[in-house]
Amino acid sequence: MVKELLTFEEVSFAYSSSSPVIERLSFTVFENEIVAILAKSGSGKSTLFRLITRLESPDQGTIVCHAQGKIGYMPQQDLLLPWLTILENVSLPLEIQGKDKKEAKIIAASFFNRFGLVGTESLYPDALSGGMRQRAAFLRATLTSETLLLLDEPFASLDSLTKTSMHHWLVSMWEKEKRTLLLVTHDIEEALLLSDRLFIFTNQPLHGFTEVQVPPDLRRKMETTEKMEQQRSSLKKDIRALLIEESLR
């Protein structure tokens, strides 16, 4: 039976006396799925993540989250501290959670092979490529949470070749780790490639949305046939038409 991991029920939120950012928003995210969130800049996506991580509390409605431990967060910029080595950066959240520094490093180091980071332990962030830095940031977020990761346009700043490589890598990691991922992206192709479902927000404040189910035979399939490409192209066309239609209203 598929378990509910995160539920928003009629959630509303506004900063002080300003207009609502989120208004009567309801949705459910299930365990071990990847949900992509498509919305225009400034629409309230960051506020949505702040509510999920409990940095903000809703003015109305309820948020139920069954994630074990803390919630992992990976922003567009890797935010690796330049004066710390990669191992020190990755183990830092474990130290903040109360682990002894030596123990934290041992735990973090045990994941470096799985995440393709062996050999970077003693290097500083400036010595790594953009893709490798994002791997380190993803590992850091993974160690923060056992079940739920929030990814805020994590690959937007990467070139197309590195982004494609990271897509392959993320899928392989998800298949091994089986965590629930919420992915904010402006890239329709990325959303269709990686996710089980898309939440397409076209209004402000965030309220209703269009949900798109990605066909099971298209989800996270890196090697595709002509038929699969046609299916993805058709879905992409429909989503783009929806976004254009709503932007003209």
UniProtKB/Swiss-Prot annotation:
**EC nos:** 7.6.2.-
Q: Name one GO biological process term.
A: thiamine diphosphate biosynthetic process
InterPro entries with a match to the protein in the record: AAA+_ATPase, ABC_transporter-like_ATP-bd, ABC_transporter-like_CS, ABC_transporter_ATP-bind, P-loop_NTPase
Keywords from the UniProt entry: ATP-binding, Cell membrane, Membrane, Nucleotide-binding, Translocase, Transport
ATP-binding as a keyword of this entry, yes or no, is: yes
Residue intervals of the ABC transporter domain: 6-228
Q: Which family does it belong to?
A: Belongs to the ABC transporter superfamily.
Task: Specify the protein name.
Answer: Formylaminopyrimidine import ATP-binding protein ThiZ
- The organism is Halalkalibacterium halodurans (strain ATCC BAA-125 / DSM 18197 / FERM 7344 / JCM 9153 / C-125) (Bacillus halodurans)
